[in-house]
Design a protein with these regions (language model features):
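Short N-terminal secondary-structure initiator segments
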Residues: 26-55, 179-185
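Short secondary-structure junctions
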Residues: 45-73, 126-144
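Glycine-rich, aromatic-bearing surface loops/beta-hairpins
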Residues: 134-189
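Hydrophobic beta-strand residues in large extracellular and virion-surface proteins
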Residues: 49, 82, 93, 109, ...
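Sec-dependent N-terminal signal peptides
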Residues: 2-12
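Long, charged/polar, surface-exposed segments that mediate recognition or autoinhibition
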Residues: 76-149
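Terminal, regulation- and interaction-focused segments at domain boundaries
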Residues: 15-42, 99-123
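Accessory recognition modules or surfaces
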Residues: 14-24, 41, 55-95
């Protein structure tokens, strides 16, 4: 009986620890390298993410198409899509790079937990980032909420933690729902 009790204790979440912390940490492992597409791809592969082909996941393909359509003939884009099972849910990681004809570039690193029904509590996100956000965007309960840190963990990029309710009009319009983590960097100007 003492062994069983010890195992149960070992499996419990530490009091005060966020149930979303593994997702937040998985995001930081890859997206801390947001200034380099190659570094993000390598970090994703090294940390157990599985790359998948364009078109293999309709929700991801829809987001990728929206991005390509926005770029049009104005520049080029490249990237990779990954997935990973974590805490019983499938997460999707998209790493991208865009460059326009003038040399302006942007890199992005995003994790989508499309099925999340509740946002990451502000206190958990603040604890994970180590400080309060520099901005909060909250256009309404039906649309969602975004916490923003500028800079992110250090100078040179931003970090966002968002939640889009399953009933949001953004789900119908863009395919967005659940928890979305974003890191972005820009340059070339």
């Amino acid at each position: 009986m003492p062994i069983a009790a010890a195992l149960l204790l070992a499996l419990q979440v530490t009091p005060g620890a966020s149930a979303e912390r593994p997702m937040l940490d998985a995001f930081r492992t890859v997206c801390d390298k947001v200034q380099s597409l190659d570094d993000m791809k390598a970090a994703a592969q090294e940390s157990g993410w599985t790359e998948f082909a364009e078109g293999a996941e309709p929700r991801v393909e829809r987001l990728n198409k929206l991005g390509r359509d926005a770029i049009g003939e104005d520049g080029t884009s490249s990237g990779a899509n990954f997935r990973k099972a974590l805490n019983g849910r499938t997460l999707f990681l998209l790493v991208t790079r865009f460059e326009d004809k003038s040399g302006f570039w942007g890199t992005g690193c995003r994790i989508y937990d499309f099925e999340a029904t509740a946002g990451i509590p502000d206190a958990d996100a603040e604890s994970w980032m180590g400080r309060k956000p520099t901005g909060v965007v909250s256009p309404g309960a039906s649309v969602g909420r975004k916490l923003l840190w500028e800079p992110g963990w250090r100078e040179g990029f931003t970090v966002e933690v968002s939640h889009v309710p399953q009933s949001s009009p953004l789900r119908e319009k863009f395919g967005l729902s659940g928890n979305i983590l974003v890191a972005q960097a820009i340059g070339g100007f």
